[in-house]
């Protein structure tokens, strides 16, 4: 159970066998644990997620490619900054089986029937009484068959930063691939760095999802010159060119459709010539808007030339996923 990850520090064989090691924890918090295997006997009763108030361990010496994930968080339990924070997993070690969960620090958690089913399901799997997958999941991003037929290709592969480079090669290496997410983490008092795709595009459709924490700020640059603003402005609720979904310093979105910080938002942008259309969370907020100049923070002023996708990383924490692109003739 949870405390076993806080034992035998300094014994690599034990840590390797378990799959992770306790590092620290913050205050008890309400978290939404995301279910990574809807068919596994330890977690299938949870459905898509399990919300619990508990003390959440932060782990080290953990490798996604060595375990089969069962429950995880996509943000820090206390700060809510984006990132991969594993909660439960299973694996095979030789002819033996390992099931681990970091939940269970409170009496009310132990009394929760869903938690009891979680523990019992994991034990039954480890004893070989029920079947369940134990192979590490593949976090590489692949577009759907429908999108592939339509010409879309992944721009971020979900597993590493291949195909991307820092705008400033000497800047802080704040970007990393975490469990299918492209995450920008900036330590307190530090300054992050923009990240730029190696490939350049002129006319295209790009689709992506992003999650921004409270108070943060980022941007998605078309051709490295036209910024679709990303901002936590949910409480503000006002239409501004500098607001979420705005073409920065150029045009406010036509509708306010921002989601709460910490929630995933979906976007689609089409640029053909100097005309830009943007969909945010399924709603069209810019419709064939003529954007004939760079909008600030851009790579250059060559607005009619192909350019890369650039993600703003110098303003705050952000996570992207499922970035895919289709070039237009």
Stretches with model-predicted labels:
Residues 76-85, 92-142:
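Extracellular ligand-binding/catalytic regions of CAZymes and related secreted enzymes
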Residues 8-11, 35-39, 63, 82, ...:
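A structural signal for well-ordered alpha-helical scaffolds and beta->alpha junctions
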Residues 20-94:
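Catalytic beta-strand/loop cores that center a nucleophilic Ser/Cys/Thr
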Residues 1, 94, 179:
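Single, functionally critical "micro-switch" positions that shape active/binding sites
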């Amino acid at each position: 159970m949870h405390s076993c990850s806080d034992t035998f520090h300094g014994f690599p064989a034990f840590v390797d066998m378990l799959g992770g090691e306790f590092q620290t924890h913050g205050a008890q918090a309400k978290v939404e644990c995301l279910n990574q295997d809807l068919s596994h006997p330890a977690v299938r009763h949870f459905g898509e997620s399990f919300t619990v108030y508990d003390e959440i361990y932060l782990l080290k010496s953990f490798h996604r490619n060595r375990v089969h994930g069962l429950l995880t968080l996509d943000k820090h339990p206390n700060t809510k900054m984006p990132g991969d924070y594993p909660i439960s997993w299973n694996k095979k070690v030789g002819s033996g089986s390992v099931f681990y969960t970091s939940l269970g620090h409170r009496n009310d958690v132990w009394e929760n029937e869903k938690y009891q089913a979680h523990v019992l399901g994991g034990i039954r799997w480890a004893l070989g009484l029920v079947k369940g997958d134990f192979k590490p999941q593949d976090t590489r991003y692949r577009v759907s068959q429908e999108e592939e037929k339509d010409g879309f290709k992944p721009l971020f592969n979900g597993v590493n930063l291949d195909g991307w480079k820092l705008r400033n090669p000497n800047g802080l290496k704040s970007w990393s691939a975490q469990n299918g997410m492209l995450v920008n983490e900036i330590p307190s008092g530090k300054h992050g760095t923009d990240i730029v795709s190696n490939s350049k595009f002129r006319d295209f459709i790009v689709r992506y999802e992003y999650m921004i924490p409270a108070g943060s700020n980022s941007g998605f640059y078309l051709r490295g010159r036209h910024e679709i603003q990303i901002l936590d402005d949910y409480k503000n609720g006002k239409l501004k060119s500098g607001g979420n979904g705005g073409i920065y310093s150029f045009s406010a979105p036509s509708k306010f459709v921002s989601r709460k910080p910490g929630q995933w938002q979906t976007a689609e942008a089409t640029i053909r010539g100097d005309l830009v259309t943007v969909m945010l969370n399924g709603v069209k907020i810019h419709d064939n808007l003529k954007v004939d100049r760079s909008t600030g923070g851009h790579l250059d002023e060559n607005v009619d030339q192909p350019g890369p996708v650039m993600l703003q990383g110098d303003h705050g924490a952000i996570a992207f996923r499922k970035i895919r692109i289709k070039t237009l003739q």
